[in-house]
Regions:
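Generic alpha-helical transmembrane segments of integral inner-membrane proteins
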Residues: 15-22, 129, 154-157
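Aromatic-acidic/polar surface patches that form glycan- and anion
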Residues: 8, 32, 36, 111-119, ...
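Helix-to-loop transition at the C-terminal end of transmembrane segments
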Residues: 22-37
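Interfacial juxtamembrane loops and adjacent helix segments
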Residues: 49-147
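Start-transfer (signal-anchor) and selected internal transmembrane alpha helices
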Residues: 1-22
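Selective detector of the "anchor" transmembrane alpha-helix that sits immediately C-terminal
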Residues: 143-157
């Protein structure tokens, strides 16, 4: 490519979006973005065939594998609803099992993610592809998060 080809806006966008997107994908700790745990739970629910959220009393959500709820809890320190969340680096010391050991995704429990049940499944299509891919390869649970993020980035670009 000549020098002028790199100056085109579409090429600059793809290059910059790829670079910055990968930086955000890798450098942002799991579940530290607003509502990420709840969006993740909604994606998992849809990936398992739960198109419509369940209503149980005042809560709305769905059946989510206990291993994934436990993983999200490992990374959340504080109150997500109020925004009082702190990320402690010491949590990375115990992250290895979530990256290396496969989890039993058959045991489930009801998880409340009420604000996300309103979103249509089509909004989560890029992440769904990532979750299905990771589940098909029987990857450890944290890979579901990162592959879902990667598919959303690719779809955006």
């Amino acid at each position: 490519m000549g020098r002028r080809a790199w100056i085109r806006p579409d090429v600059c966008f793809v290059a910059f979006a790829s670079l910055m997107g990968m930086a955000c994908l890798v450098l942002t700790p799991p579940f530290q973005v607003a509502d990420e745990p709840n969006h993740f739970f909604r994606i998992v629910q849809i990936a398992q065939g739960g198109i419509v959220g369940e209503r149980r009393g005042a809560e709305s959500g769905g059946e989510i594998p206990v291993a994934l709820v436990s993983m999200a809890g490992h990374f959340i320190d504080g109150n997500m609803a109020s925004g009082e969340v702190r990320w402690e680096r010491s949590r990375w010391a115990n992250v290895r099992p979530y990256l290396q050991q496969r989890a039993d995704l058959t045991a489930t429990r009801f998880q409340d993610f009420r604000a996300m049940t309103r979103y249509a499944p089509v909004a989560y299509l890029p992440q769904l592809v990532g979750i299905w891919f990771a589940e098909a390869l029987n990857l450890p649970p944290l890979w579901l998060v990162y592959i879902g993020r990667f598919c959303a980035l690719v779809f955006f670009i």
